[in-house]
UniProtKB/Swiss-Prot annotation:
Keyword Cell inner membrane: yes
One Gene Ontology MF term: lipid binding
Principal location: membrane
The protein's name in its UniProt record: ATP synthase subunit c
Site residues by UniProt (Reversibly protonated during proton transport): E65
Biological source species: Hydrogenovibrio crunogenus (strain DSM 25203 / XCL-2)
Membrane-spanning parts: 15-35, 58-78
Annotated family: Belongs to the ATPase C chain family.
Location in or out of the cell: Cell inner membrane
Known partners and oligomeric status: F-type ATPases have 2 components, F(1) - the catalytic core - and F(0) - the membrane proton channel. F(1) has five subunits: alpha(3), beta(3), gamma(1), delta(1), epsilon(1). F(0) has three main subunits: a(1), b(2) and c(10-14). The alpha and beta chains form an alternating ring which encloses part of the gamma chain. F(1) is attached to F(0) by a central stalk formed by the gamma and epsilon chains, while a peripheral stalk is formed by the delta and b chains.
Gene Ontology CC annotations of this record: plasma membrane; proton-transporting ATP synthase complex; proton-transporting two-sector ATPase complex, proton-transporting domain
């Protein structure tokens, strides 16, 4: 019975990690699109501000690009060092 509980925890964790990674990728893609579109709108309105706008775009795009990698690190932690398994084993008295 205990093995089934542990397997259920790993299965739920795998599903959760998949959803989290998909959401992080989708959020990053939407963020990239918004950043680039607003930068192009700003350049179209004020072409002389192009260098400043491009600098800001690359800074914020770098921050946006780092978000999925941070989420990936948390996902790997949940997959390989799952804190819920230890809690379940303690609750079951193993």
């Amino acid at each position: 019975m205990e093995a089934q509980f542990i397997a259920d925890i790993y299965a739920a964790t795998a599903i959760g990690v998949g959803v989290i990674l998909a959401a992080a990728g989708l959020g990053s893609a939407i963020g990239w699109g918004l950043i680039c579109s607003k930068t192009l709108e700003g350049i179209a309105r004020q072409p002389e501000m192009r260098p400043a706008l491009m600098t800001n775009m690359f800074i914020f795009a770098g921050l946006m690009e780092s978000f999925p990698f941070i989420i990936l690190a948390f996902a790997m932690w949940f997959l390989f060092a799952n804190p819920f398994v230890g809690a379940m084993q303690a609750a079951l008295g193993a």
